[in-house]
Design a protein with these regions (language model features):
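Small-residue-enriched transmembrane helix starts and helix-helix packing motifs
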Residues: 1-24, 101, 108-128
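Membrane-interface helix termini and inter-helical loops of multi-pass transporters
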Residues: 2-7, 70-79, 141-154, 178
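Structural signature of hydrophobic alpha-helical transmembrane segments
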Residues: 14-31, 80-89, 156-169
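Juxtamembrane transmembrane-helix termini in multi-pass membrane transport proteins
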Residues: 14-64
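Generic transmembrane alpha-helix signature in multi-pass membrane proteins
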Residues: 17-23, 32-38, 125-130, 137-147
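Transmembrane alpha-helical segments of integral membrane proteins
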Residues: 34-36, 166-178
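Juxtamembrane helix-boundary/capping and inter-helix hinge elements in multi-pass membrane proteins
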Residues: 37-48, 81, 115-119, 146-152
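Membrane helix-loop-helix hairpins that form the core translocation module of multi-pass transporters
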Residues: 48-102
């Protein structure tokens, strides 16, 4: 087997490994339901803006976790268990609010326009962290970063997989209300 074939196999293997590991953990399909429920009061333009910001923030978080996640968590003394607990509490609260929301009579409520600074803050917390790229995604990304050998094809495959997952996040959140 020549070097090109080995690098190609390594690239594809790293892509498939990272993509199939991250996608079910992040689960943007169910995350889109929370997103639509919690942003129902926003205009379509604001919801689109928040979805784009969530994708961007998710990309940044996943890349930082890939390259430096284990160092950062150790530096601050944060365990994955603490992140997992906080993420669970936020998910529980969001689910509880969705279950106890007042019944809608079919008429649409007036849409609100919020300042961009408020939308950015909303996009980061709680949507990006911990709902989208929460403790599970952080732990998995740190594990991927420490498991795969550092070579160009593995790194390229993993980065492309993260980009693909972020694209799925954006698509699900952007068009989740349709």
């Amino acid at each position: 087997m020549d070097l090109t074939a080995m690098l190609g196999a390594s690239f594809v293997g790293a892509f498939l490994y990272a993509f199939t590991t991250l996608l079910p953990v992040i689960n943007p399909f169910s995350g889109a339901m929370f997103f639509v429920t919690l942003t129902g009061h926003l205009s379509d333009a604001d919801r689109s803006y928040v979805a784009g910001r969530i994708a961007l923030f998710s990309l940044i978080i996943l890349m930082v976790c890939l390259f430096a996640g284990h160092i950062i968590l150790g530096f601050f003394g944060i365990s994955v268990g603490v992140l997992r607990c906080a993420g669970g509490i936020v998910l529980f609260a969001a689910g509880w609010n969705a279950l106890n929301a007042p019944a809608q009579d079919g008429t649409s409520s007036p849409k609100m326009e919020l300042p961009r600074s408020r939308l950015k803050a909303m996009a980061f917390y709680p949507f990006t962290l911990p709902l989208t790229t929460g403790p599970g995604a952080i732990a998995v990304t740190v594990a991927i970063g420490t498991t795969l050998p550092y070579n160009f094809s593995n790194l390229a495959g993993t980065i492309l997989a993260i980009l693909a997952v972020v694209a799925v996040i954006w698509l699900c959140f952007r068009y989740g209300d349709r």
